[in-house]
Amino acid sequence: MARYRCCRSQSRSRCRRRRRRCRTRRRRCCRRRRRRVCCRRYTVVRCRRR
């Protein structure tokens, strides 16, 4: 569905959604509960941990 961009220059507390994919594969954004949280060294599947 909607894609979220990497939180490279953004704060990890919020992630803005964008149509383009993340530039880095290590950083991905996932949705935690109802809020969107950026993951640093975790994939979307393992985004439950900070």
UniProtKB/Swiss-Prot annotation:
InterPro entries assigned: Protamine_P1
Protein name as catalogued: Sperm protamine P1
GO terms for biological process, alphabetical: chromosome condensation; sperm DNA condensation
Keyword terms of this UniProt record: Chromosome, Developmental protein, Differentiation, DNA condensation, DNA-binding, Nucleosome core, Nucleus, Spermatogenesis
Residues forming coiled coils: none
Tissue distribution: Testis.
Single GO MF annotation: DNA binding
Similarity comment: family membership: Belongs to the protamine P1 family.
UniProt function note: Protamines substitute for histones in the chromatin of sperm during the haploid phase of spermatogenesis. They compact sperm DNA into a highly condensed, stable and inactive complex.
GO CC, alphabetical: nucleosome; nucleus
Subcellular localization, as worded in the UniProt entry: Nucleus; Chromosome
